[in-house]
Design a protein with these regions (language model features):
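Active-site rim helix/loop that mediates acceptor-substrate recognition in acyltransferases
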Residues: 1-18
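Short amphipathic alpha-helix that is part of the acyltransferase structural core
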Residues: 1-4, 22, 120, 129-130
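Conserved beta-strand in the GNAT
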Residues: 20, 26-35, 43
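A short acidic/small-residue loop/turn micro-motif
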Residues: 35-37, 109
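Short alpha-helical
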Residues: 39, 88-89
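Conserved acetyl-CoA binding element of GNAT-fold acetyltransferases
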Residues: 40-52
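Conserved acetyl-CoA-binding loop-helix of GNAT-fold acetyltransferases
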Residues: 49, 56-69, 92-96
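C-terminal "cap" of GNAT-fold acetyltransferases
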Residues: 77, 84-87, 97-100, 107-130
Length: 130
């Protein structure tokens, strides 16, 4: 994993962190996150392995583990992320990595809501403090 620096991220987030997964010199995926100070939760705002042929080979897990290290170091009480209800592979991936469903938004993506079979799912993982 390598740290990614991008002025664009800095413009819209306070202290964003991003990491890239590389195969040789090619970026194959990335993850970004930041601490939501107002509620002390660490928001994983994006995680992606670009090529579907490279998924389920460990890059996504490595990216998630890396950003979770930062989430833990941040002192946040919980790590949170969102996915879409039709993305069963992502939901399974997050559950396998200790996340649970903590909320829904029927109208996040469309005013037609559930009729379009696309509900926003909020998932979270408690970060334990000693």
């Amino acid at each position: 994993m390598e740290s990614l620096e991008d002025d664009m991220l800095s413009d819209w987030l306070d202290n964003p962190i991003a990491y890239g997964a590389f195969e040789e010199d090619k970026l194959i995926g990335f993850v970004e996150g930041f601490l939501e100070e107002w509620n002390n939760r660490y928001r994983i705002s994006n995680i992606c392995v670009f090529d579907s042929g490279l998924r389920s080979k460990g890059a996504g897990t490595a990216l998630l583990e890396k950003i979770m290290e930062d989430a833990d170091k941040s002192g946040a009480r919980m790590a949170v992320l969102e996915t879409q209800s039709y993305n069963s592979k992502a939901i399974s991936f997050y559950k396998k990595n200790g996340f649970e469903i903590i909320g829904f938004d029927r109208y996040a993506y469309s005013n037609n809501g559930p009729e379009e079979h696309n509900i926003r799912i909020e998932m979270g993982k408690k970060l334990f403090r000693g």
